[in-house]
Amino acid sequence: MTMDQVPISRSQLPAHLKRLESESIEIIREVAAELKNPVMLYSIGKDSGVMLHIAFKAFFPGRLPFPLLHVDTTWKFRDMIMFRDELAKKLGFDLLVHTNEDGLRAGINPFTSGPSLHTHVMKTEALKQALDLHGFDAAFGGARRDEEKSRAKERIFSFRAEGHVWEPRNQRPELWNLFNTRIRPGESLRVFPLSNWTEFDVWHYISLERIPVVPLYFAKERPVVWRDGTWIMVDDARFPLAPGETPQLRKVRFRTLGCYPLTGAIESAATSVEDILDEMRTTRISERQGRLIDTDEAASMEKKKKEGYF
């Protein structure tokens, strides 16, 4: 199956999801029309899946006018990489995969290097390398304002100065649906079509549109160890066990996905999208509770974004 053959769902969306979908389509089309060389960042998660699905709708029955980019740290869950490769083969989109080879040669990893250095080298620097290598002037991301406080104040069209630097005080006003896409050479934009969506909106949309997601989002018995106040999955042989530490099988799932040593699971019985929606109706805890990279230092997410992070 190729992109121009992708079936578009005809589900009856509720009014608020229709409004969010229309806004996202308008944003994606605006970037494609105004920027010279955009790219869509694909992290393999649920938000990326929704953003990609909406992009298909925006240009159906034509092909996507931009490639997808996955920054591969080499520490993603195996299920994520398998899902990525199968989806790319099925839909036939143009997928670029970039890894910071300098970081690999230096032996940077989540265990001995720590979350901060690993994230900076293998995610932030790798992303900037890929954007510069291909000359992309705009990058779509699946971030939402309800995820985290620094993202809550970021514009939909997030202006990045030369070197991909984000300065919150220099962001441009966004009045209604009017966006300023003008940039000088060396400058770029990060664009977030799902800014106004919530986690519940995303899962509700996935349910109605029947969008496939990585199986890690659903509860299953998995080998985990208790570290840093959360369950960490032992996904491959590279995981160094502490003295006396033994993986145990627990029925867990993930609300957010990243590098497996830095992503905590939650105990859950949710084995379907409908179960997840039911679970979310009662939860009062942020989905990013399991992201260890968000808790490594004060204001860490804003600091990372200023350095060029997603």
Swiss-Prot record:
Pathway annotation from the record: Sulfur metabolism; hydrogen sulfide biosynthesis; sulfite from sulfate: step 1/3
Q: Which PANTHER family match?
A: SULFATE ADENYLYLTRANSFERASE SUBUNIT 2
Q: Name one Pfam family in it.
A: PAPS_reduct
Q: What is its EC number?
A: 2.7.7.4
Name the Gene Ontology molecular function terms of this record: ATP binding; sulfate adenylyltransferase (ATP) activity
Q: What general EC class does the enzyme of this chain belong to?
A: transferase
Q: What is this protein called?
A: Sulfate adenylyltransferase subunit 2
Which HAMAP family did the record assign?
Sulf_adenylyltr_sub2 (MF_00064)
**Function summary:** With CysN forms the ATP sulfurylase (ATPS) that catalyzes the adenylation of sulfate producing adenosine 5'-phosphosulfate (APS) and diphosphate, the first enzymatic step in sulfur assimilation pathway. APS synthesis involves the formation of a high-energy phosphoric-sulfuric acid anhydride bond driven by GTP hydrolysis by CysN coupled to ATP hydrolysis by CysD.
Catalyses: sulfate + ATP + H(+) = adenosine 5'-phosphosulfate + diphosphate
**ATP-binding: is it a keyword of this entry?**
yes
Q: Which gene encodes it?
A: cysD
Q: Which SUPFAM superfamilies match?
A: Adenine nucleotide alpha hydrolases-like (SSF52402)
Q: Which domain of life is it from?
A: Bacteria
Give the keywords, sorted.
Answer: ATP-binding, Nucleotide-binding, Nucleotidyltransferase, Transferase
Q: Which Gene3D superfamilies match?
A: HUPs
Query: Quaternary state and partners of this protein?
Result: Heterodimer composed of CysD, the smaller subunit, and CysN.
Instruction: Give the family from UniProt.
Output: Belongs to the PAPS reductase family. CysD subfamily.
Q: Which GO terms describe its biological process?
A: hydrogen sulfide biosynthetic process; sulfate assimilation
Does the keyword field hold NAD?
Answer: no
